[in-house]
UniProtKB/Swiss-Prot annotation:
Gene name of the record: TIGD5
Full protein name: Tigger transposable element-derived protein 5
Keywords: DNA-binding, Nucleus, Repeat
An MF annotation (GO) of this entry: DNA binding
UniProt key word Nucleotide-binding: no
Organism, as annotated: Homo sapiens
Principal subcellular localization: nucleus
Stretches for region Disordered: 1-45, 185-233, 535-587
Length: 642
């Protein structure tokens, strides 16, 4: 192999043979290489104290920036905060970003943040936070579901109706943490408690309420709160009371001499057919409460086993079908106060409202007093006077009632809803009643009277109240205020332009009523239709016509021939059923039983989906089947018209 090193002697030239000479001396021995040092063993670990990384808040960063701007040396600032110089210079460079981030969050909440991280949907976040601050400045309490619903509404407004943004509980929690908002339970937001007044005389205990009235508050109501800016248009409500013959048709309202001779010359009219209706709405007409219907029946059969909360109108019982003091108090605390608070909360308004109530018109004793020898009859039919306004308000005084004055013609303040809204409601109700009567044209008016029940009346009352336009309610307030503050008779021409639209709507409804009455009754004059419309405008029936004092009686059925059976399932005619196409024709009793089964099933469905039209038509078919089959109508049956 090749030598490890260069040759010891001179290197011969190429191409020449080396000259002979003495042999070269042997090379000196190379000393052996030192063995490598042994590998060092594991060194003992020495504990080194590492500095913890600290995240500084935006407040600390801005304080360091202000100290540097104030002329302090950066070295001393770094020493105080425990940061290197590069970190401090990075803070100085990011000062505009820090200021902008605080503006986005708002308030002192953002100074505690350590990371500049905004929401994924910045526009929705800013809109919800601005809306939240605006409402809290007015003292409106807000809940989590309400804020989440408003966030989804803002998302649809910003990104369009196809936006899929969902304000979940996680989003709401992050929104709270981002803006430093905490959830608290409010038991009241009243001001400092007023000094307790001196003890007064004992208060007389209120009488027991009927089944339809609500409980009285446990404590005496507090004085009304001081007016902080007054009430807005949506916080001012008005209520009016009116009477209504709920199932009276034009044929039964014929003038004296034109009706049934056996009815005393004033047509068929029953005491149980008249009810009292309470209507309430705010000034703008944007919130209309459910009508309150007061009747003489304590437990109407048609309302049994039904959830009355689903009906568009409420029913209460009164012996004289009038709005008594306990009924008004129960309606105020059970329906008006909860409904108004829900509306104000949904509209993001302050939780306060006022209700203007006109004293119900008392019918004259000559018109409403029954012809009885008993001395307690006039007292029973006379409406009970309403209490003072101080007794009708919530314990905190936020929602209260003011009664309009009722004195001389000059000092009397008319109720706003009495300036055409109540009359429009009655006309719309009677138009829908005539439509139902015309739709049941297959039977006689007697069949319709038996098939139209109080449950259908509640549905028609709610439908008619919904048909009253909000603009009509708002304009009626202008008429009422003009009559209250300018009672001079020579200044009635100022409201003519505002009444043009009302007159057009009024004429259209009257035209519909006349047309429907002509379809239902061929020989009915327009004057008779007008008299039927204004029959229940006064406190009682017209002069010369007394209401029957006994219980509500169904109209007298036409006499049945002696050959017809008087009970269901009896008679020889039912046994002689003929065959038609191999199938026996059902008897009248079987047909009535089948229709009644279908009616019971239909009545247990949602009344908002079924509607009164189909129910009335089915009852009319049952009444017609009874009449054609000669089956007697049982007084205790479910089709007594109530």
């Amino acid at each position: 192999m090749y030598p490890a090193g260069p040759p010891a002697g001179p290197v011969p030239r190429r191409g020449r043979r080396p000259l002979p000479g003495p042999p070269a001396p042997a090379p000196a021995p190379v000393p052996a290489a030192r063995p490598p040092p042994p590998a060092p063993g594991p060194r003992p670990r020495v504990a080194v104290k590492m500095a913890f990384r600290k995240a500084y808040s935006i407040k600390d960063k801005l304080q360091a920036i202000e100290r540097v701007k104030g002329g302090e040396r950066q070295a001393s600032v770094c020493r105080d905060f425990g940061v290197p110089g590069g970190t401090l210079r990075g803070w100085l460079k990011d000062e505009p970003k820090l200021r902008w981030f605080l503006e986005q969050l708002g308030g002192e909440v953002g100074t505690q943040r350590k990371k500049m991280r905004l929401a994924n949907e910045e526009e929705i976040d800013r809109a919800v936070y601005a809306w939240f601050l605006a409402l809290r400045q007015h003292g409106v309490p807000l809940s989590g579901p309400l804020i989440q619903a408003q966030a989804e509404a803002f998302a649809r407004q910003i990104y369009g109706p196809e936006c899929t943004f969902k304000a979940s509980h996680g989003w709401f929690w992050r929104w709270q943490k981002r803006h430093g908002i905490s959830s608290q339970r409010f038991y009241g937001e009243a001001g400092p408690p007023a000094p307790s007044p001196a003890p007064g005389p004992p208060v007389k205990e209120e009488p027991a309420l009927p089944s339809g009235a609500g409980p009285l508050p446990d404590r005496a109501p507090a004085p009304p709160p001081p007016a902080e800016g007054g009430y807005g248009d949506e916080q001012i409500y008005s209520a009016s009371v009116t009477g209504l013959y709920w199932k009276l048709l034009p044929e039964q309202a014929a003038p004296p001499g034109a009706g049934d001779p056996g009815a005393g010359g004033c047509g068929r009219r029953w005491r149980g057919d008249r009810v009292t209706v309470l209507l309430a709405a705010n000034l703008t007409g944007s919130h209309k409460l459910k009508p309150l219907v007061i009747g003489r029946l304590p437990d109407p059969p048609s309302l049994r086993h039904h959830n009355q909360d689903k009906f568009p109108a409420s029913y209460r019982y009164s012996p004289d079908a009038w709005l008594s003091r306990p009924l008004l108090r129960g309606w105020f605390f059970e329906e008006f106060v909860p409904g108004v608070k829900r509306y104000l909360r949904r509209s993001c308004l302050q939780q306060k409202a006022v209700l203007l109530v006109a004293h119900p018109p008392c019918p004259s004793p000559a018109a409403s007093m029954p012809a009885l020898d008993s001395e307690d009859a006039p007292v029973r039919c006379r409406p009970e006077p309403l209490g003072p306004p101080e007794e009708l308000q919530t314990p905190d005084g936020a929602v209260r009632v003011l009664f309009l004055s009722k004195g001389s013609s000059r000092a009397h303040i008319p109720a706003p809803l009495e300036q055409g809204v109540v009359a429009a409601f009655k006309q719309l109700y009677k138009r829908e009643l005539l439509r139902l009567a015309v739709s049941c044209a297959s039977g006689s008016p007697l069949d319709f009277m038996r098939s139209f029940m109080l449950k259908d009346m509640l549905y028609l009352a709610g439908l008619s109240w919904d048909l009253v336009q909000a603009g009509s309610i708002e304009r009626c307030w202008l008429l009422g205020l003009r009559a209250a503050f300018e009672p001079r008779p020579g200044e009635d021409s100022a409201g003519q332009p505002a009444q043009a639209e009302e007159a057009a709507e009024h004429s259209r409804v009257l035209s519909d009523l006349t047309h429907l009455a002509a379809l239902a009754y061929k020989c009915l004059a327009p004057e008779e239709v007008a008299e039927w419309l204004h029959l229940d405008d006064d406190g009682g029936p017209p002069e010369g016509c007394r209401e029957e004092v006994g219980p509500a009686l169904p109209p007298a059925a036409p006499p049945a021939p002696a050959s017809l059976p008087s009970a269901m399932g009896g008679g020889e005619d039912e046994e002689e059923a003929t065959d038609y196409g191999g199938t026996s024709v059902p008897t009248a009793g079987e047909a009535v039983r089948g229709l009644e089964t279908a009616l019971r099933w239909l009545e247990n469905q949602d009344p908002r989906e079924v509607g009164p039209l189909r129910l009335v038509q089915l009852r009319s078919l049952i009444s017609m089947a009874r009449r054609l089959g000669g089956i007697g109508h049982t007084p205790a049956g479910p089709y007594d018209g109530v």
